[in-house]
Amino acid sequence: MIKLREFREFWEKVSEKIPELTDTLAVTVDENMARKITGLSLGSRVLFWLPPGMEGTGVHVDAFEEKHLCVVFVMEKYDPSRKECIDVLESTQETIDRVLREIIGSQWYGCSPIGLADLKISILPETKFFAGFAGWSLAFNAKG
């Protein structure tokens, strides 16, 4: 399995390289998460990451292969009465592209905790993640 500490540190490093990101937060379902999200100021552009899920397959015990579903979000908190959702999508598109380039670039170093299991990556617009947020999700499979 992917070590959560290494996974968190990877996203923190990615966030440090992209100045328009104001924070990096793990998405958990608890009261603290709700407080953190509602406490973010308007205009905050956050890299949210989900702890990865794991699926394993194999014909034999010695040929067991792990794949981890990884999902991150680049979301901006905005005031829907002052800004259109499409404007937020436009302004965050370059940021999600930079996150994608960091993921792909990290594969060259050989020590990334998220080695790509395949080159299938999905990026989708997100407008209902939380009220007052819009942006993009990025999903991919990583090797264990």
Tell me the role of every PLM-derived stretch:
Residues F48-L50, H68, M75-D79, L116-K120:
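Alpha-helical context
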